[in-house]
Amino acid sequence: MLHQPIYAPVPMLAADVNCFWALEQDQESYNREVYLPDAYIEVIINVGAPLVLESEHGMLELPRAFVNPLQNKPLRIRAAGFCQMISMQLYPWAVKPILNIDADPSTVHVIGLDADWQRFADDLTQIVAHRGYGEAIDCYQEYVCKTAYRHKHDLMLIRTAGHLLHGSHGQIRMADLATQCHLSPSQFERQFKHYTAISPKAYARIVRFGSLQAALLVNPSIRLADLADVYGYSDQAHLIREFKSFADCTPRDLAASAPAYFELRQNEDWCDFMKQYFNLSYAG
């Protein structure tokens, strides 16, 4: 999706929250897009027109406050008018300690949050309307700080492993991660799945896909064989196969069907942000 302003988390949340972001987009262009699988979990507050989820069971109207958990296929959300939203982008191990809920990517498309969150979403809608996104994000962070970490969680090892996965674009060996956590491979996988509802190997694939997608958006003409080498795929065919398993399209299809990003690529600040955000020094 086409994120606009990005806000850094306050120190209390910095280890478990990647960022906060705000989005405004007209209905037509928003409804052409899809949420591709991503290595983060989005806690979305809709402050604009109603949103509906397209699924195999039909259309489902979404609550104001909901979670987009880890996905393994594209997610289609449609707006009934002008789209306005703000989101907290969580690392997946932080769902339990920050939201006090479980997130299972294999069975749940989105997770509606409880009544307190829905009331808070109504308040944020008014704040955005009258005082803007910056103040709304400040209020969002304050609300999360008051409700997060209510219970004791031993996150240090899994948090460290997760950041190592991100830093390596999903290419670090699972045995090496387990060793750095001073756990056996089976213990490491069990603890990782307890907090993320996904195996570390499966999560590494999503991390790698996210970095690959970002590299293509920054430079759609980059050679796929070069990307395969950078990301540790056995060859170009392997890269395309993996990409299609998450995106339901080829890498070139994605680049050709994302006109908003073609326009954004003319903005040097956006390209610099993407390169730094995903460590894309080779995608220039």
What does each model-identified segment do?
Residues M1-A175, T179-P185, S199, L216-L217, ...:
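Alpha-helical bundle regulatory/interaction domains
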Residues I45, R208-S211, H238-R241:
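Hydrophobic side chains within alpha-helical segments
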Residues R190, I198, A202-A214, V218, ...:
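Catalytic-pocket segment enriched in acidic/His residues
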Residues F192-I198, R241-L254:
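A secondary-structure capping/hinge motif
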Residues Y195-T196, V207-G210, F246-A247, A258-Y261:
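The DNA-recognition helices of helix-turn-helix-type DNA-binding domains
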Residues Y203-I206, Y233, A237:
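Conserved structured core elements
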